[in-house]
């Protein structure tokens, strides 16, 4: 026989249709990359592979062994797998990816940011009539291919909805770290006027002693800002999946 064959003891392997020989290692079969161990057969689930003196982790489908890339929810946690190679990112690499996509938005116009409000509405979320700050945060995670990392893929453009949900999920802290979402409540803000918990959000790109730098949609476009950690306007930070 040839193709995928069950060899017993939960071992499935693949035999070349032309030569009949057993294929091992990384193989492109039926439109997907798969990894086949000579002894244990087709790899499924999270799999460590030794390559060029280092160990990388890949995620192979639990049913057919096909290689998964991009964001994946595995073992009760979000992870990102390189879109080309499938290699699982480290948590630090995931943070750097979000920062990279955040900085790429720097200098964007107000109209660009307001366009992200329309993106949220097109994706099924509600429209915040007070500005595009949260829609911009959500767009950055989506553009990075990491929408699941932000509140498990919740879609909306109101900052208070994200803050409330992330507190409920235990995804909230008062200690800023790079890649987190900073939430704000300004004095005499619309949030106070309408009775909600937050009225602004930006992404942290740098943290110092008593301060943190953000990128977000504010008056005039998408800009950098620096805030004091002890400021009364701080109401905490949303924790994306790479810190959980």
Regions found by a protein language model. Give the residues of each.
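Residues that flank catalytic or metal-binding motifs in active/ligand-binding sites
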Residues: 32, 77, 178, 198-200, ...
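Hydrophobic beta-strand residues in large extracellular and virion-surface proteins
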Residues: 98, 102, 137, 141, ...
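...with weaker cross-activation on analogous glycine-rich loops/strands in unrelated enzymes
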Residues: 147-222
């Amino acid at each position: 026989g040839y193709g995928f064959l069950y060899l017993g003891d939960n071992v499935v392997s693949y035999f070349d249709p032309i030569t009949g020989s057993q294929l091992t290692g990384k193989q492109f079969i039926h439109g997907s990359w798969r990894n086949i161990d000579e002894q244990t057969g087709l790899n499924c689930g999270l799999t460590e592979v030794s390559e060029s003196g280092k160990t990388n982790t890949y995620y192979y489908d639990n049913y057919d062994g096909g290689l998964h890339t991009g964001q994946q929810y595995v073992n009760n946690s979000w992870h990102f797998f390189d879109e080309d190679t499938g290699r699982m990112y480290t948590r630090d690499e995931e943070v750097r990816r979000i920062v990279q996509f955040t900085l790429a938005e720097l200098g964007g116009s107000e109209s660009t940011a307001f366009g992200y409000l329309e993106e949220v509405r097109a994706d099924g979320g509600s429209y915040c009539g007070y500005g595009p700050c949260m829609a911009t945060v959500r767009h950055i995670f989506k553009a990075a291919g990491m929408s699941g990392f932000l509140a498990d893929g919740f879609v909306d453009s109101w900052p208070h909805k994200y803050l409330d949900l992330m507190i409920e999920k235990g995804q909230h802290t008062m200690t800023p770290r790079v890649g987190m979402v900073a939430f704000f409540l300004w004095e005499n803000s619309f949030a106070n006027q309408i009775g909600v918990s937050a009225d602004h959000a930006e992404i942290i790109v740098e943290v110092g002693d008593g301060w943190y730098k953000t990128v977000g949609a504010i008056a005039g476009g998408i800009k950098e800002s620096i805030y004091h950690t002890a400021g009364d306007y701080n109401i905490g930070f949303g924790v994306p999946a790479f810190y959980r």
